[in-house]
Amino acid sequence: MNLLNLKNTLQTSLVIRLTFLFLLTTIIIWLLSVLTAAYISMVQKRQHIIEDLSVLSEMNIVLSNQRFEEAERDAKNLMYQCSLATEIHHNDIFPEVSRHLSVGPSNCTPTLNGEKHRLFLQSSDIDENSFRRDSFILNHKNEISLLSTDNPSDYSTLQPLTRKSFPLYPTHAGFYWSEPEYINGKGWHASVAVADQQGVFFEVTVKLPDLITKSHLPLDDSIRVWLDQNNHLLPFSYIPQKIRTQLENVTLHDGWQQIPGFLILRTTLHGPGWSLVTLYPYGNLHNRILKIILQQIPFTLTALVLMTSAFCWLLHRSLAKPLWRFVDVINKTATAPLSTRLPAQRLDELDSIAGAFNQLLDTLQVQYDNLENKVAERTQALNEAKKRAERANKRKSIHLTVISHELRTPMNGVLGAIELLQTTPLNIEQQGLADTARNCTLSLLAIINNLLDFSRIESGHFTLHMEETALLPLLDQAMQTIQGPAQSKKLSLRTFVGQHVPLYFHTDSIRLRQILVNLLGNAVKFTETGGIRLTVKRHEEQLIFLVSDSGKGIEIQQQSQIFTAFYQADTNSQGTGIGLTIASSLAKMMGGNLTLKSVPGVGTCVSLVLPLQEYQPPQPIKGTLSAPFCLHRQLACWGIRGEPPHQQNALLNAELLYFSGKLYDLAQQLILCTPNMPVINNLLPPWQLQILLVDDADINRDIIGKMLVSLGQHVTIAASSNEALTLSQQQRFDLVLIDIRMPEIDGIECVRLWHDEPNNLDPDCMFVALSASVATEDIHRCKKNGIHHYITKPVTLATLARYISIAAEYQLLRNIELQEQDPSRCSALLATDDMVINSKIFQSLDLLLADIENAVSAGEKIDQLIHTLKGCLGQIGQTELVCYVIDIENRVKMGKIIALEELTDLRQKIRMIFKNYTIT
């Protein structure tokens, strides 16, 4: 985190970045200088040590050479003086300090020459000094004459003085040097000898301890060793074995050279030809250099700190503070007026920057003032343009609403008149003309709906109305729209609902049906042979609708544009070109998507994918039915096992291949043993309601009024809201159908006044809005203001019958007594005297009640079974029992538990009705 903060700081601050770079550079230079100084010091120190060692070694060599040369000179002088001596008398020497010894054990008496040599040494003037110990004369008979009387007389002691102790040949210039020998109590000695023509050796012994001691005096951390002519260590050279091994493995020469860990100086001495080798350890050299560096570091480090501190202070004072002042002023100008200026009292680059920035601010101030004036002018122009656009958009919305109202009002009259006409006795030709007129009216209505929906989607005023929707009836309604055109083209139709597809789910049923109708309509339009298939399947939490056809297909280059508004792949085809555009937009609004796959000459498949939010999982119907093989797969998805049909039955109807809702209802009736009871008029409700119709359009009042009368209802007409409010004080109504767009007081305001009217006989009755507007905002506004339901014009008999039934259930729930339908109009099945039919009806109802009782005992859901029982009783005209079942159904919906005693009581009432038809 600290490194990240440092990185951010370095990236955002120039001064800190410069300071950091300077410090880093200074430290690097300082380190380089320290390392360079250390290297130079090491080189210089090495050179100084080499020079010191060279000087000291040279002095030691000179001293040693001088001693060895004096010894050689003494030996030579001894020989020379002996050769000049003639006769020496014993009395001439006093006292007697010389001795005669014989190396051989059998020869104890000196010869004449031996005695002569002894007397010569006695009388010679060679004095023993500090570095010469003894003088000897050794003849060819191994007789030794010694100058000192303290020399030992035993042979072992004299052995080093014999000829055998010297090399066969002179070391140099006729001088013979012996190997160094150690004498107890006397230390290390070496002898130098010279031979005359008779082979007599004249020797002088040299003391070595003082030379060895002096060779270690120059530097206390150097090592001095002595080597012979063969580079072998002399016996008095004591060094560690590791260094000894290194020296033995190196070819040494005079001068300086290196071995691992040491500097070496070798110098050859005169006389015996020995070499003095000085070893100086590298570690000592490095320690001396490190000591010097450590002595210098405090000073250099102090100088570094002082220098960097001074530079940082100067940088802060001369650069950082002015820059921060500049940044502060610049930041203030970003949000404050451009009146602030940078200080410009310096004569450097910062002053130039300040001057340029101030000049820029002056220019910006002028441009800003001009821009403000232009912005004010443009803002005013934009506001005026916005207001004009809003007024135009508002006029457009009003115009669309007016167009919708003006188009739907006559369409309502046309469609209502045709439906009323179809309820009258017509011959086959007249019925065909009526069907054609109705289909053309519905096609025209679909075109109007598409155009209005497209306009509302474009303007963003389109919203969805989500509610629980029954899937299978919706599919039947969509397939019903293409049944006629498909049969006229002799196209096969097929619907398949997959396993686990919910029968009830949460969606906008109107818009989903609109999408399917558009897709199916296009499939019929562009398919000449083959068939059309609607498939519904579930994948995880998605519901997938597939509409496939065997038409001519769409070219690949046209598929990407097929959802574009007003685009037509075939310019010769009919249509507005916005059906797929609306379907795609609606799918996206519903949280899904619409995709297309097409192969030219083979066909097209359009898939609609919608999310499953709230739904009821399907409950399988367990049983076995005799049905055509083509229905077995669909029945199996609902839990029904299919068997080949052995006789004529209702499942052989070809329409069941594409009307899956009818197939499901019929299969449920057959499994539950509910006969397919022939009802004379499926639309006729079992109740006669008091209905108030409020509409300012004469044609609407006339047509809708007649449609309500044809459904067996009592209708009261009101042409305005004021008239409706007056009637509310005179009569109680079960249902009020009211147009929401009326002059003076509109329908929504009328409902509000209706609820607030103190003299109203039933202020809480059900209101259903009648309107030519399909705008979702109008629907929401109606429900927000106390209107229960909303019907868009044109209305159909089926729609009116459905809302009459809803109003009847609403009133029964409020314990309002209703009038039963006129028995002469109802034509209930129970009116027949057919013993077999009535017996089957009783058996079916009895089995259905048994299923309900078993479900209650097992704690399972009974809402679907109760709904089926209510429909059966309604079809046979048992209004009293329908009321009883509706009460049970309402309590089930509220989550209350139904007691078995209530079902037993219902069974007794049914037995009382069918007591004359019970087969025992």
Curated annotation (Swiss-Prot):
Inducing stimuli: Induced early after entry into host cells in an OmpR-dependent manner. Induced 3-fold by an acidic environment. Repressed in conditions of high osmolarity. Repressed by methyl-3,4-dephostatin.
Annotated phenotype, changing H100A: Decreases expression of genes responsive to acidic pH at neutral but not low pH. Decreases expression of genes responsive to acidic pH and at low pH, lowers survival in macrophages, and decreases fitness in mouse
Membrane side Periplasmic: residue ranges: 41-291
Database matches in CDD domains: HAMP (cd06225), HATPase_EvgS-ArcB-TorS-like (cd16922), HisKA (cd00082), REC_hyHK_CKI1_RcsC-like (cd17546)
Domain called Histidine kinase: residue spans: 402-614
Side of membrane Cytoplasmic, spans: 1-19, 313-920
Protein name: Sensor histidine kinase SsrA
Native species: Salmonella typhimurium (strain LT2 / SGSC1412 / ATCC 700720)
Gene (name only): ssrA
